[in-house]
Amino acid sequence: IITSALSIQDPRERPMDKQQASDEKHRRFHDKESDFLAFVNLWNYLGEQQKALSSNAFRRLCRTDYLNYLRVREWQDIYTQLRQVVKELGIPVNSEPAEYREIHIALLTGLLSHIGMKDADKQEYTGARNARFSIFPGSGLFKKPPKWVMVAELVETSRLWGRIAA
């Protein structure tokens, strides 16, 4: 779920003129310790809604929840493709959902250059090669930043932001 989510453009939309409204809609998926797990929460919600609603009603739901329907479909397609490849390679799939620790150890192996330690005086982190970044405002960790953080990507706009954090 997380791997396929990270391989596409984020399905959560945050229009400039509706940032607060979209943040409120997306907040229900937040995990207080990990934005990566927010993808799992969103995935579970979408699965429940897709089963309960007609195709058109599901599209409308995506629009009102500030979710891009085409990106959601792409996410689902990539997830299905990854499951098929894993099956063909004979790699065992968890029968139970993985725990927080196992998920983040697995993620950390691919994100070593995206680790940061919080500066005691500021809301900034110092990462690899002394890169200084802040947690993105849309993150579930933005208001209560941890001492150490791992982010999926660093994006430079008005400043350097760490997006999708744990």
Predicted feature residues:
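Second RecA-like catalytic domain
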Residues: I1-A166
